Regions:
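Domain-level signature for soluble enzymes in the chorismate/prephenate branch of the shikimate pathway
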Residues: 1-241
Length: 241
């Protein structure tokens, strides 16, 4: 059985996947981007995928929200992971030698104040671990705390995220529904057939009517025309209720 995640080994997705508890034995399959993770799960009945959906600093991970909407996959659980970044560089460099850094877009966003204070230029790669491959004289990488040492790189600075309480929520996804013995939350994707005044309010008021708390609401464009959306709603209730 396969477990797909955004690789390579050492990414936050990998660390979240290591926290995934299951009675099944999974072969870890690293993939190059998050869309590919969800697409692979949708085609593999025996697979599970681990994807980030929300960060306490950045908010919703849009590429994941959009990919979930366009593939037949279902959330079976979630994992919360503390996010801690370090700056890595060439062994001959100090912090003062660095003029540019690389990382994945969410990592850049979550360390942007630090980047500006250091007056670094920055650019993007597809994963935090891939950024380590960009390291050379004067070029650094922003990657998970402890990951750079594994690949033989030098730590230039630690705990560089802009906010100390940085947590990412990951979803455990499969391509089929499955009975969960004691579910306590449900994620809905609501796609209205047409737009009208008060549409979202009427949807949310339905949950209020039944005294159901909502812990996450996110709108994403349908990508058909401007102003037309579907909505993710996470309700603190079991789906069979």
């Amino acid at each position: 059985m396969h477990l797909y995640y955004l690789g390579p080994k050492g990414t936050f997705s990998y660390l979240a996947a290591k926290q995934f508890e299951s009675h099944e034995q999974y072969d870890f399959i690293p993939l190059s981007n998050l869309h590919e993770v969800i697409q692979s799960v949708s085609k593999d009945k025996q697979a599970v995928g681990i994807v980030p959906i929300e960060n306490s600093i950045e908010g919703t991970i849009n590429i994941v929200a959009d990919s979930l909407a366009h593939h037949d996959v279902y959330a079976h659980g979630e994992i919360q992971l503390d996010i801690d970044f370090s700056l890595y560089g060439h062994h001959s460099n100090s912090l003062d030698d660095i003029h540019k850094v690389y990382s994945i877009a969410p990592a850049i966003s979550q360390t942007i104040n630090y980047i500006h204070r250091q007056q670094f230029d920055y650019d993007y790669v597809d994963s935090t671990i891939q950024s380590l491959n960009m390291i050379k004289d004067g070029i650094g990488a922003i990657a998970p705390l402890g990951s750079g040492e594994t690949y033989g790189y030098h730590t230039l600075d630690q705990h560089i995220q802009d906010y100390p309480h940085n947590v990412t929520r990951f979803l455990v996804v499969k391509n089929h529904t499955h009975f969960i013995e004691h579910p306590n939350t449900t994620i809905f994707l609501i796609t209205p057939k047409y737009d009208k005044p008060g549409l979202l309010a009427s949807v949310l008021n339905t949950f209020t009517l039944f005294n159901i708390n909502l812990s996450w609401i996110e709108s994403r464009p349908l990508k058909t025309q401007l102003g037309i959306y579907h909505f993710y709603v996470q309700a603190d209730t079991a789906i069979n209720n």
